[in-house]
């Protein structure tokens, strides 16, 4: 079997200037970089759908040389408004994993709400479940975001919502 790659994205943005720690995890790629990547793979790789890649693997058939599939997790609006036109321009198929609970509303994912809340707070100290987190600098905020996100990932949604209020 030939090697294959799956390129996973979350979002694509035209926003050049983040504020504070927004997008500190790099979840949203710059549109110009994304376009360069799609142009490159469309000209230099065999781009197939994830469905076709799975079918080949399950059938124990060889993948085309330099085989690539493109996927998007989550359901950010910028996938439709920014990424999709670029994908169409280069005729790159993609698989979209949509978080259905987010469709049709303007709520943020809990991790994005957490990032936004920590980024926008004027507080210098956060006490959460008996632990103290410093929020004086962007570095402090990123460190706090990482630690609190790790802690909340294993919690029930109701607990996350309580913490985020």
Predicted feature residues:
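C-terminal domain-boundary segment and adjacent tail
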Residues: 26-62
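Structural preference for beta-strand elements that scaffold enzyme active sites
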Residues: 4-6, 67-69, 93-95
